């Protein structure tokens, strides 16, 4: 059963935006690890941040209300429909201090609010086509900024989003078009605008690779917009597992195939199949076969590739007839 973000913040499901902000402010200050030294404070602080991020964002909150945490993180369609599973997937960035700094306009509001200190958090950090929509900001994201003193133009912490790519996309490279919605400031005041950010995913890019778009976050008076950072993540694959530039595949074979040294047909990421074990050697549970050059491209040298590493899952029979057991006992060495 997934988390109940309303319960974490001590709210009813009909809570208003203002009540959500007040609950987060109270609990975040209470459980901030710099102030609260209890062993549970760190985990409680993280739960509170995640609950606020979901409930303060209308899109995330609508999905959570309809599908719960599992639906929110498992890729349910957005509240506007669209019919495509996986059209929106949320993953908490895992940094409750960044949420705290965004909300209060400071990584240390205790000093700013109570001692007059100036300790503001300063951010700053660089095929197939897909379009994904993210709402970058939110009307209440920086509700308490005006209360924190500042002597220079501050920048909000980077806004990070995971960008999931398939192994096929990593193999060939691809282009991702990410449509964002953000607040901008004009002569007539703030307004919402949409913009498409184009990301060229290079062949062989590793999970964890960061693509930074400087100052593409929400705009506000006397503040430098946050950088938007996309982080490459590997989509799970039905056949292969990635290990650096190598690919791992587990072939299912029978005990007969293993003992008789059968040829084993193995798929490749490119769609073809190859025959493994050409010398008809006995295949043991620990046996592996390495096929050179059938892995992923080396990021800085795409003409070079890693290897395809094949391991074997040998299926043993559940039962054997007594007569067959006797034959095997005679035939097989001790």
Curated annotation (Swiss-Prot):
Q: Which GO terms describe its cellular component?
A: cytosol
Family annotation (InterPro entries): DnaJ_C, DnaJ_domain, DnaJ_domain_CS, DnaJ_subfamily_B, HSP40/DnaJ_pept-bd, J_dom_sf
Q: Name all J domain ranges.
A: 4-68
Record-given protein name: DnaJ protein homolog 1
Induction description: By heat shock.
Q: Name one GO biological process term.
A: chaperone cofactor-dependent protein refolding
Source organism of the structure: Drosophila melanogaster (Fruit fly)
Gene symbol of the encoding locus: DnaJ-1
Q: Which GO terms describe its molecular function?
A: DNA-binding transcription factor binding; protein-folding chaperone binding; unfolded protein binding
Instruction: Answer whether the UniProt record assigns the keyword tRNA-binding to this protein.
Output: no
Q: Which UniProt keywords apply?
A: Chaperone, Cytoplasm, Phosphoprotein, Stress response
Q: Mainly resides where?
A: cytoplasm
Give the source lineage, highest ranks first: Eukaryota, Metazoa, Ecdysozoa, Arthropoda, Hexapoda
- The yes or no answer to whether the keyword Cytoplasm is present is yes
Q: Where in the cell is it found?
A: Cytoplasm
> List-wise, which residues carry Phosphoserine?
187
């Amino acid at each position: 059963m997934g988390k109940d973000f309303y319960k974490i913040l001590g709210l009813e499901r009909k809570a208003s935006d203002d009540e959500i902000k007040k609950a987060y402010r109270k609990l975040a200050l209470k459980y901030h690890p710099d102030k609260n030294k209890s062993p549970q404070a760190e985990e409680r602080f993280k739960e509170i941040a995640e609950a606020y991020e979901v409930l303060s964002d209308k899109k995330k909150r609508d999905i959570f209300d309809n599908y719960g945490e599992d639906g929110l993180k498992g890729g349910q369609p957005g509240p506007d429909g669209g019919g495509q599973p996986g059209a929106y997937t949320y993953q908490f960035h895992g940094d409750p201090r960044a949420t705290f700094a965004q909300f209060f306009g400071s990584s240390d509001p205790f000093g700013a609010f109570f001692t007059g200190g100036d300790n503001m958090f300063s951010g700053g950090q660089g095929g197939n086509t897909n379009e994904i929509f993210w709402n970058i900001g939110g009307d209440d994201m920086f509700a308490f900024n005006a209360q924190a003193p500042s002597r220079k133009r501050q920048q909000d912490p980077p806004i990070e989003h995971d960008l999931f790519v398939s192994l096929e996309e990593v193999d060939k490279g691809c282009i991702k078009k990410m449509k964002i919605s953000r607040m901008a400031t004009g002569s007539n005041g703030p307004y919402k605008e949409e913009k498409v950010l184009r990301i060229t995913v290079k062949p062989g890019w590793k999970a964890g690779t960061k693509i930074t778009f400087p100052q593409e976050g929400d705009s506000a008076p006397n503040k430098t917009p946050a950088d938007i950072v996309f982080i490459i993540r590997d989509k799970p694959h039905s056949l292969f597992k990635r290990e650096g530039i190598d690919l791992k595949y587990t072939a299912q074979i029978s005990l007969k195939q293993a003992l008789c040294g059968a040829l084993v047909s193995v798929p490749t990421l490119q769609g073809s199949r190859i025959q493994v074990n050409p010398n008809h050697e006995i295949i043991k549970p620990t046996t592996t076969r390495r096929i050179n050059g059938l892995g992923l491209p080396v990021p800085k040298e795409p003409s070079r590739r890693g290897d395809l590493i094949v391991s074997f899952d040998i299926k043993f029979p559940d039962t054997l007839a007594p007569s067959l057991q006797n034959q095997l006992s005679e035939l097989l060495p001790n």
